[in-house]
Amino acid sequence: MADNLRRLVSNEALRSLQDKLESWLREYNANSCDQNLNHCLELIEQVAKVQGQLFGILTIAAQEGGHYDGVETIKSRLLPWLEASFTAASLGKPVDSKVPSLQDTFDKDRHKESGTRDIQQLDADLSATRNQLNQVQDDMAETEKTLEEPKNRSAISLLAAEEEINQLKKQLKSLQAQEESRHRNSDRRRSEKRGSERRRVELRGSEQRVSDLDRRSANQRNAEAVCDYEKQLRTLKDEIAVLSAEKSVLQGRSARSRSPSPAPCSRSHSRSRSTSPSSAKARTPSPNRAKLSSVARKAALLSRFSDAYSQGRLDAQCLLRRCIDKAETVQRIIYIATVEAFHVAKMAFRHFKIRVRKSLTPSCAGSNDFEDAVSDYIICHLDLYDSQSSVNDVIRAMNVNPKISFPPEVDFCLLSNFIQEICCIAFAMQTLEPPLDIAFGADGEIFNDCKYRRSYDSDFTAPLVFYHVWPALMENDCVIMKGEAVTRRGAFWNSVRSVSRCRSRSLSPICPRTRIGLGMISRSRSPSPIRCGLPRF
């Protein structure tokens, strides 16, 4: 093969072929057709000779490779070229490199075969994985069954063990009871023997103890009697001092003015004056009340006020509903009673504080803690407040109030307990620092969500208050407890006409000469629509 290749290299056929092509190109236009054909055939013959030599070299090279070497190269290089050459020769077209060759088809077929093999391999792997998954699931089910069996066995054994333990406990208890009964019997016998011996010894010592106790009891009785006599003597002296102070005060007032005053006309101060102290030592302060701090008293009063709203108000409504069918009238009556009770209690507190100041002045004059002493005395002696007189004043004020429309057979004395509780709460609230008071409320005012909450039967879109159900509790300008109000649209103007025609069951507040009229006129506070003769819009 090397010799043939050497001959081909040494042969100058390829070099002369290039020279012939160049000369033919120069003479192509000048030559005739036959001359051009002859030149072309000569070139083809020369190329055919070169191809023959190359095919010989190819054959020898393939033989040197054996049976299998070089097969892929021939398939990939020679066969596609031959296919394209023969196809182009048969069609009379030049060889085009873009025409798909056998190599491309072979490559495509090979890729298709490899793709199908891969798909088959993947299908086989997937089926194997599924088989493994099914096997694992079966194994899990079997393991669950195998685990449940020992669980059930252990549960059964546990129940059996518990039953055995319970039986053993019962047996142990029975044995312990038997042992205890035996010990008790033996202890009883021993205790009886010891008791008989102790009784003998105690009988001997009891005689001596009885004699000693008789002596001690006689001495204690004598000492207690002496203490009682001393206490009675002190109380008598204090009462004498109180009476003498009251007498001097009354004499001084009668000497100053003979005309009757509005304050003594009411019974709200008669009882408290009769029991007014002349000095801070007239009545010993209650230890339970003295220990209460301002915060504790405030919390207790707030709780009482809340109970009065939640329970006392409902009880009063039940009492009034027996005589009055209209719920609006009942709620108005209770609200007015609460407002009047606060007003009367505040007035009573002012008078009570003035009297305490006068009674404490001789002993505490010039003291820096005089006001503190007055406040402490009032806190410790809240039981001196004449609440029943305040109740009577509240009922009288309600009888002349033109806001309340009611049948003549209803008596406001039904609300005495409720009014008394409100008066006591309001009186005690004045002892706080700062004092608590109810908020001013007027029918037809703009509803304030911070002070009041609407009742269940209200119109929640109405901006004005139709009437109040319960007042709000205030500390200075801060709301401590919200009140309750009813809001309705268009109902306030109708209520104004009905209120102007309502009846009064007692004397008119316009009469200036009556006792009730003087008491009402003497009140000094901001005008309220509840007390005005005409409704306020």
Curated annotation (Swiss-Prot):
Query: Where, per UniProt, does this protein localize?
Result: Cytoplasm, Cytosol; Mitochondrion outer membrane; Mitochondrion matrix
Which Pfam families does the UniProt entry name for this protein?
MIEAP (PF16026)
Where along the sequence do coiled-coil regions lie?
115-253
Q: Where along the chain is composition biased (Low complexity)?
A: 253-287
On this chain, the residues bearing Phosphoserine are: 85, 127, 154, 157, 286, 508
User: InterPro entries recorded for this chain?
Assistant: MIEAP, MIEAP_C
Task: Establish whether keyword Membrane is in the entry.
Answer: yes
Q: Does the keyword Cytoplasm apply?
A: yes
* Residue ranges with Basic and acidic residues bias: 179-217
Give the start-end ranges of region Disordered: 171-221, 249-293
Q: Which domain of life is it from?
A: Eukaryota
List, in alphabetical order, the Gene Ontology terms for molecular function in this entry: cardiolipin binding
Q: Which GO terms describe its cellular component?
A: cytoplasm; cytosol; intracellular membrane-bounded organelle; mitochondrial matrix; mitochondrial outer membrane; mitochondrion
User: Which UniProt keywords are listed?
Assistant: Coiled coil, Cytoplasm, Lipid-binding, Membrane, Mitochondrion, Mitochondrion outer membrane, Phosphoprotein
Q: Where is this region: Interaction with YWHAG/14-3-3 protein gamma?
A: 1-273
- GO BP field: mitochondrial protein catabolic process; mitophagy by internal vacuole formation
Assembly and oligomerization: Interacts (via coiled-coil domains) with BNIP3L (via BH3 domain). Interacts (via coiled-coil domains) with BNIP3 (via BH3 domain). Interacts with YWHAG/14-3-3 protein gamma; a protein that also plays a role in MALM.
Record function comment: Key regulator of mitochondrial quality that mediates the repairing or degradation of unhealthy mitochondria in response to mitochondrial damage. Mediator of mitochondrial protein catabolic process (also named MALM) by mediating the degradation of damaged proteins inside mitochondria by promoting the accumulation in the mitochondrial matrix of hydrolases that are characteristic of the lysosomal lumen.
Can you tell me which family this protein belongs to?
Answer: Belongs to the MIEAP family.
Q: Name the chain's protein.
A: Mitochondria-eating protein
Origin organism of this chain? Bos taurus
What gene, per UniProt, encodes this protein?
Answer: SPATA18
